[in-house]
Amino acid sequence: MARSSTLAFLKTEPGAGFVMTLAALAALALANSPAAGLYFDFIDGRVPVGVGPFFVSLSVEAWVRDGLMAVFFLSAGLELKYEVLRGEISSPRRLAAPLLAGAAGMVGPAVIYLLVNLGPGGDLRGWTVPTPTDAAFALGSLALVAPRLPRALRLFLLTLAVADDVGAIALIGVLYSHGIHWRALALALAVLAVMLLLARRRRPPRLAFIAGFVLVVALTINSGISTSVAAFACAMAVPVDRRSRDGESLLRAYQAALQPYVAYLVLPLFAFVSAGIALSAHPPGGWFSRPVWGVALGLTLGKPLGVFGMVFLSSALKIGRKPMGATWSEMLGVALLCGVGFDLSFFLCGLALPADQQPQVRLAVMAGSALSLAAGSAVLARRQWVRDQRGGADVFAD
C-alpha cells in the first residue's frame, strides 16, 4: 500500500517538483563534500559526437543544457499548441488576463533587476534570469497545498506559465544565438520543411517526426542557434488533428510519451548539473553582489508585483478579469508562486552571465524561488482553510 501511494504521488505535479528538488539538493551537497572533485569532473567531462562532416565536443553540462533541454522545450511547445487550439485556453476571453499578466510578470523582475544593478558593481546582462516561471513547481505547489480552490486558478497559472516559456524561448533566440553557421542552419530548416510536408498527410508516420526532431536539434547545435528555438519550431510542425495508423492523435501521443521523461529525467538531470555550487570556492562578498540581489528581489518582488498588478489593472479597465470564482487573496497567492524560477532561470543564468558570477546567481535563484514558494503556498493554504471552514463557498469573497 505504501509503495503504491508513493508511485501515485510521483506521477503528480508535486511529485515531479519533489524529484527535481532532490536532484538540486543532491548536487549542492556533492559540490560541498569530499566527493566534489568527482561531481565537477563528471559535469565538466567532454563528450565528443560526430556524424559525417559534423563534429561537436561538449561537456556533460552543455549536452544537458543544449541537448536534453531541447526535449523540455519540445514538450512545452506541444502543450502550448494543443491548449491554444483545442484545450482549456482556446477561448480568447480566457487568454487575455493570463497573457497580459505573463508579459507583466516578465517585465517586473527585469525592471527590478536593472534598477538594483545600476551603478558600480552592477551587471546589466543578467536581467533575463529572474523572468521565467517554473510551471512544474508552481502548478505542483498549487495542487499540493490548495487542491480545492477554484479550477480557474490552475488554468490561469497554466496559461501564464506557458506564456512565460514562450517569452523565455523568444529571449533566448534573440539574445543568445551567436556566430551562426549557415550551412547547418539551412540543413535544419530543410528537415523542418520536410516535417511540415509530412504533417499534411492523412496518416503521418510517427517515427519520421522523432527522427526529424533529433536531426534538427543536432544541426542546430552546430548552427549557433539556441536549440530551444529549434525544439519549439519542431513542436509547431506536429499536427493537432492528424492521427497515426493506430488512430491516436500524434500530438497527444507525443505529449503523453514525453511527459514522464521530461519530469523525471530531463529536468532533474538539468537541476543536478546546474545546482552544484561550491560555497567555499567563492569569496563571501560575491554572495551579496548587485546581480545576486537583483535576481532574488526580481523573483520575490518583481514577479508578484507584475502579475498581480496587471490582473488588477486589466480587471479595472475591463480588458481582462481575474480567474472566475477566485478572490484577490487567492490571486495574490498565485502571483507569489510565479516567483519560482528554477529550471529556466538556471538556463538563462548560464547564457547571460560570465562563469565567475553564475554560482552566486544560481544560489540567488534557489533562495528567491524558495521564498516565493513558501509565501505563495502559505497564502493559498490559508485561503483553502478559510474556504473549508465555510463549507467550500467563499461568501465574503474580497
Question: Locations of the language-model features?
Answer:
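Interfacial helix-loop-helix linkers and transmembrane-helix boundary segments
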Residues: A62, Y82-A97, G122-L124, P150-A152, ...
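Entry/N-cap segments of selected transmembrane alpha helices
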Residues: E83-V111, H181-A193, L279-L305, W328-A335, ...
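Predominantly late transmembrane helices and immediately cytosolic-facing juxtamembrane segments
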Residues: A2-T12, A29-N32, G45, L171, ...
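Structural signature of hydrophobic alpha-helical transmembrane segments
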Residues: E61-F73, G122-A136, T159, S177-A190, ...
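Structural signal for the N-terminal portions of transmembrane helices
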Residues: F213-V214, G285-V292, A352-A374
